[in-house]
Amino acid sequence: MREGIHPKYNEVTVKCLCGNTFQTRSTKPEISTEICSACHPFFTGKQKLVDTAGRVERFKKRYGM
């Protein structure tokens, strides 16, 4: 590899809106994110059930089912 053409690869802190922080490596000095594995519903197991009954009824009404 040629020297002087690659960006510096440093340890950085990733900060989530939920308050969770963790270390990783990146060429950016700081990383902010809205959702991380500590607060994402898929990883926490606290998935919200979406009530789709209104959508189903509207579909049936629209297409005469």
Swiss-Prot record:
GO terms for cellular component: ribonucleoprotein complex; ribosome. GO terms for molecular function: metal ion binding; rRNA binding; structural constituent of ribosome. InterPro entries: Ribosomal_bL28/bL31-like_sf, Ribosomal_bL31, Ribosomal_bL31_A, Ribosomal_bL31_sf. Keywords: Metal-binding, Ribonucleoprotein, Ribosomal protein, RNA-binding, rRNA-binding, Zinc. Zn(2+) binds at residues 16, 18, 36, 39. Binds 1 zinc ion per subunit. The keyword Oxidoreductase does not apply. Its cofactor is Zn(2+). SUPFAM superfamilies: L28p-like. It comes from the Bacteria. One of its GO terms (biological process) is translation. PROSITE patterns: RIBOSOMAL_L31 (PS01143). Pfam families: Ribosomal_L31. Binds the 23S rRNA. Belongs to the bacterial ribosomal protein bL31 family. Type A subfamily. Part of the 50S ribosomal subunit. This is Large ribosomal subunit protein bL31. It comes from Geotalea daltonii (strain DSM 22248 / JCM 15807 / FRC-32) (Geobacter daltonii).
